């Protein structure tokens, strides 16, 4: 005798699972009414928060470094341009 089949998961259930496991951000789609009230899984909460902080810090450092490098590069180009113009 066949066991009763479980229905396939709905779109919202799949999306909730993806959000819980961090594969999708809760703001990926406009239909997030069911995601907003979803707490992060309790077991790995502190580690997850720590990782998020580390990732944000890392992104901040990278972006700051890129901004400084861009400013230095522009200053260098202006300096070279001025030196070349003075020689003529």
Swiss-Prot record:
Its main location: membrane. A motif (PPXY motif) lies at residues 8-11. Keywords: Membrane, Phosphoprotein, Transmembrane, Transmembrane helix. The chain crosses the membrane at residues 58-78. Late-budding domains (L domains) are short sequence motifs essential for viral particle budding. They recruit proteins of the host ESCRT machinery (Endosomal Sorting Complex Required for Transport) or ESCRT-associated proteins. Contains one L domain: a PPXY motif which is involved in the interaction with Itch, a member of the Nedd4 family. Down-regulates the TCR/CD3E complex and the transferrin receptor TFRC in host T-cells by blocking them from recycling back to the cell surface. This is U24 protein. It comes from Human herpesvirus 6B (strain Z29) (HHV-6 variant B).
């Amino acid at each position: 005798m066949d066991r009763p089949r479980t229905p396939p998961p709905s779109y919202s259930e799949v999306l909730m699972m993806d959000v819980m496991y961090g594969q999708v951000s809760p703001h990926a789609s406009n239909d997030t009414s069911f995601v907003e009230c979803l707490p992060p899984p309790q077991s790995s909460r502190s580690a997850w928060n720590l990782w998020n902080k580390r990732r944000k810090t890392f992104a901040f450092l990278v972006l700051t470094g890129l901004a400084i490098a861009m400013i230095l590069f522009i200053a260098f180009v202006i300096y070279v341009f001025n030196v070349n113009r003075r020689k003529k």
